[in-house]
Every structure is written in structure tokens, then in C-alpha cells.
Amino acid sequence: MLAFGLQALAGAAPGSGGRNAPGAADGPRLILISIDGFRWDYLSIYPTPALRRIAESGVRAESMRPVYPSLTFPNHYSIATGLYPAEHGIVHNHFPDEARNRWYHLHDRSSVEDARWYGGEPVWVTAEKNGLVTAAYYFVGTEAAIGGVSPSHWHSFDASVPGGDRVTQVIDWLAWPEARRPRLITLYFEHVDRAGHDFGSGSPELAAAVAQVDANIGRLLDAIEDLGLGDEVYVLVVSDHGQASYVDPEATFVLRDHIDLAGLDVVAGGAYAWIYQEEPDPERARAIRDAINAAWAHGRAVLRD
């Protein structure tokens, strides 16, 4: 791709305390923008003047390969940490922790804000530990004090907040005095992903969502120039995955027609499914794997290890 109300809290120690360390106020600033579900070729399919503006004045990748599974939470946290899901622990948008007998779910505030789910060290934590102020208008992990450290300023995810309001906050952060002005800002737009899920790729609704997000980014770019920050602010636009319309009845696999679901928890979403045993039984796990692989030509079951 292109190269979650408000919680204005001071970063928990050992963070920056909301002020850049001496000598840290100067230097480049990074705005990390994620457009959820923005497929690699949307840049050429749809009118995207703001994104093209970034691409033409900088660098871009022509394609991307998401980590597995190609879902929002695992991929965003991989972007933030540089780790694979098996290493940082966010392996799905919702999944169990068998040791704690608890579930993580992207819509559950208590789990999203619980730092025990998040392994590795996201980039904003590294920055805060080095005395740099960070701010987040949404990004997976920013609502938890990971390693005891939060961004200096962050918002709890609220899909009802318009993209334009999010951009207004980012512009406000950029206008702060240098001592308090964030060196790293994250900004997240879910609108393209939502339109793709609800209406499909190639739909008018998806095109409208792309146009809306692009316009908001264009407004941000103009504000950066108006503030005289064009030479010190870097804008990095990323995505977590793409989407494609796919209909093939033969590819549908009904688990209960092939295995006994008693004693199993099944987490399914999109092209992926996880099967958890309520009581570990390696022999049964292997039998389930083999039964699925024998009956399904369009997918493959593997054991966790």
C-alpha cells in the first residue's frame, strides 16, 4: 500500500508525560494513516486525488501481502509491532485465552483495553519510552497501557465519529506548541472496509467510501501545508487487507455435516475458522483435521502447532 470519546491522558510512566523530552521536539513527525480494507488497486480504480498526491510526491508499494489471518486486528497490530500474530498474540478479531478462560473480542471494551492480550512493543510505546509525545485517533492497541505505557493522547473507538471530526483533531494536535506537539500520530478510517463488507467490492457504496476517505486525507494534507509543516511531517498510508467479491457454492463447507461439534468451540469469519476443544484431546484433533481435509477440496485444516 501507500508509502477507538476522547481520553486526553498523560502517558503512564515511563511515557513522555505529554511533553517532548529536551531536544525531542524538533525533527520529523509521522502521521500513520490506516484505511481498513483498502485494496492495493483501489488507487487506480477510483478517483483518489489526495492519495495520488502522496504517491506522486513519495513512494508507494504496488501490492501487499497481509499476515495470516488477513483480518483487521491481527494485521493492524502487526503493523504496529513488526511481529506476526503468533508472536504478538492478537491472532483473530475474537479468540480465547484458554489459560485465563477468557475471550478477546474487538467489540468488548474490557478486552480491548486489557494490556495482557497484547504482546510485543508497538511503535507508540517505543516512542513514549524515548520521551516523544504520541497521539492516536484509533489504532489497534492504543486503548491499552501496553507495558504500562499509553499514547499521551488517545480516543476510544467510536464508529459514529465522522472521519472529518477525526481529521479535525489531528490538525489540532499539529497546531500545538512544539513541546506538546506529537511526534507520532495514528489515524484510522474503517469506512472502506465496512462498505466492502456490506455492499461488496465494486459497489457504488464502496466508491463513495473511498471518495470520502480520500477527501478527508486531502483536507489533512492541505492543513499540514497551511501550518507550515510540509517539510517536517511525513504521511504514511497503510491498509490491513483488501477485499474481493467471491461466490462459489461448492466452496462452502458445513462443519456439522462432517464432524461432531460436541465439546468444540468454533470461531468462523470470512475465509477462516478456528476450532477449539473444550477439553484437549490430541487424537481427536488429528481426526478432525483429517476428516476436514478428506472432505473439502477448497481449503485445508492444520493443527495449531
What are the roles of these predicted feature ranges?
Residues 41-88:
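Short, structured active-site-proximal loop/turn typified by the sulfatase FGly-forming signature C/S-X-P-X-R
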Residues 1-8:
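Bacterial N-terminal signal peptides
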Residues 26-31, 57-61, 129-135, 179-185, ...:
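Loop/turn elements at helix/coil->beta-strand transitions in domains of secreted/extracellular proteins
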Residues 26, 62, 107-108, 219-305:
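Secreted, luminal/periplasmic, and some membrane-associated catalytic domains
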Residues 163-175, 192-233:
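A long, amphipathic alpha-helix that forms part
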Residues 83-200, 284, 294, 300:
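His/Asp/Glu-rich, glycine-adjacent segments
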Residues 37-42, 65-66, 109-114, 124, ...:
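Second-shell loop/turn segments in exported
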Residues 37-40, 60-61, 67-71, 85-86, ...:
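Solvent-exposed loop/turn segments at secondary-structure junctions
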